[in-house]
């Protein structure tokens, strides 16, 4: 993982590998949709945890990646909110 990593609390939801490659942690349904629509690639090491990979070389890829990062962040917020209300 690079120093360009994004967290919500202690949960890492995205991190870069170089200037154009990013891994993003999605919910399982989000992961399935991103893979089915070909806006993300299978993560090499941790697909079972919801991770996908994106390569950013075009404006369209950048826009799709931004949407996935937003989904990942929103999932983190939702998980934290659910965890707090369960206490």
Protein language model annotation of sequence segments:
Residues 47-87:
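Well-ordered alpha/beta subsegment
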